[in-house]
Amino acid sequence: MRKPLIICDFDGTITTNDNIISIMKQFAPEEWTALKDGVLSKDISIRDGVGRMFNLLPASLKEDITAYVLKQAETRPGFKEFVSFLDEKGLPFYVVSGGMDFFVYPLLEGIVGKDRIYCNEAAFTSRNIEIRWPYPCDGGCGNDCGCCKPSIIRRLKGRDDFVVMIGDSVTDVEAAKCSDLCIARDYLLRECEELGLKHAAFGDFRDVRRILEETAEVKEWMSEQKRQELAEVKKELAERDWFPATSGNLSIKVSEDPLRFLITASGKDKRKETEEDFLLADEEGRPAETGHALKPSAETLLHTYVYQHTNAGCCLHVHTVDNNVISELYAKEKQVTFRGQEIIKALGLWEEHAEVTVPIIENSAHIPDLAADFAGHLSGDSGAVLIRSHGITVWGKTAFEAKRMLEAYEFLFSWHLKLKALQAYHV
């Protein structure tokens, strides 16, 4: 399996315009156009051309240039959400820019950390602006790139990594040649077509996300990451003995469109770890892959409803003595309410006198009927429903959140039953 490594240009890719070109049009004398044309025709190296362009600008313009570029720069639609998606999926992502630190860092602040940004440095200490090049070409590149994207890729890449390059301009061509897939627009797209490089065209970062989700190597890696995450949750819950007699089922969402999620296989002892603990299900809860005899858990339809009607990323269903007793005690009320416990904060309720109510629905051997009743209580991206004498189903945006909520509810159930027993004893 190949681990994805995603490299993204900045100017004209993350931003809608090339910020260096915008700066030159606004502040530079006309000599800059000849330098720009020389870079595009490849008669002048990127490092030489860009360095000379900035050297046309007086350092005294620092504040004016900075204010101008930060005001006029626009981020391409979907970028912030794209980075959140990558972080959620654990996909390695780096911005490698031929741009300058004084505008790259501020424009990415709060979205991409500096430890994941490679760019050039502008010095304003002399009469005119001077550019420093902290990431020059290594021995494998002789193109005098400035911020050498191929060299940085070689530095970051593992032996079997699947490299994805996202870019738009002449400064991205050599990096595209080093990648397994180039997601391109404008000049770079035409170069990829001419050079016969594996590529896909994009308009904004919603397109980039879709392309990644449809790329086999990326899909395989994301699915395996989710499999490992769910396996860790299963292991922790098994250590608590929350899977008696093969009961319970767990799932985690792998992709949104089309909906795909991993779910525990039916009839398996979940206290054991095997290669066939989970299978991939589709939006109807059916196996999404062939070549195996695994069947989804009986309550898969409940998990399907969770993913169809909320933004949850993980759903957990367990049978414990405590949650079954609670559901029986309060079945007539069709709900149970807890208050006055500090652990309620684990459910995202931080008010001093917060309370939480868990709905209780009747059990049914006919899963479609059970699922229809269950669906009526799906509100928000996290929540819980007790099924009478049939355990609790909890969902959350992440596996960590869902597990934390499950632990909190089970604590409340255990506390409540012990308190009632002590109160009865002392009557």
Curated annotation (Swiss-Prot):
> Cellular component GO terms, alphabetically?
cytoplasm
Region (MTRu-1-P dehydratase) residue spans: 222-427
GO MF terms held by the record = 2-hydroxy-3-keto-5-methylthiopentenyl-1-phosphate phosphatase activity; methylthioribulose 1-phosphate dehydratase activity; zinc ion binding
Which stretches does the entry tag as region HK-MTPenyl-1-P phosphatase? Answer: 1-221
Its transmembrane ranges are: none
Q: How is the cofactor bound?
A: Binds 1 zinc ion per subunit.
NCBIfam families assigned to the protein according to its UniProt record, in alphabetical order: DKMTPPase-SF, HAD-SF-IB, PRK06754.1, PRK09552.1, salvage_mtnB, salvage_mtnX
Cross-referenced Pfam families: Aldolase_II, HAD
Give the record's keywords alphabetically.
Amino-acid biosynthesis, Hydrolase, Lyase, Metal-binding, Methionine biosynthesis, Multifunctional enzyme, Zinc
Task: State how it assembles.
Answer: Homotetramer.
Q: State the EC number(s).
A: 4.2.1.109, 3.1.3.87
Pathway entry: Amino-acid biosynthesis; L-methionine biosynthesis via salvage pathway; L-methionine from S-methyl-5-thio-alpha-D-ribose 1-phosphate: step 2/6; Amino-acid biosynthesis; L-methionine biosynthesis via salvage pathway; L-methionine from S-methyl-5-thio-alpha-D-ribose 1-phosphate: step 4/6
* GO terms under biological process: L-methionine salvage from methylthioadenosine
* Swiss-Prot/TrEMBL catalytic activity: 5-(methylsulfanyl)-D-ribulose 1-phosphate = 5-methylsulfanyl-2,3-dioxopentyl phosphate + H2O; 2-hydroxy-5-methylsulfanyl-3-oxopent-1-enyl phosphate + H2O = 1,2-dihydroxy-5-(methylsulfanyl)pent-1-en-3-one + phosphate
Give the top-rank taxon of the lineage listed in the UniProt record for this protein. Answer: Bacteria
Identify its protein family. In the N-terminal section; belongs to the HAD-like hydrolase superfamily. MtnX family. In the C-terminal section; belongs to the aldolase class II family. MtnB subfamily.
Task: Indicate what this protein is called per its UniProt record.
Answer: Bifunctional enzyme MtnB/MtnX
Q: Which gene encodes it?
A: mtnB/mtnX
Q: What does this protein do?
A: Catalyzes the dehydration of methylthioribulose-1-phosphate (MTRu-1-P) into 2,3-diketo-5-methylthiopentyl-1-phosphate (DK-MTP-1-P).
Cystine crosslinks: none
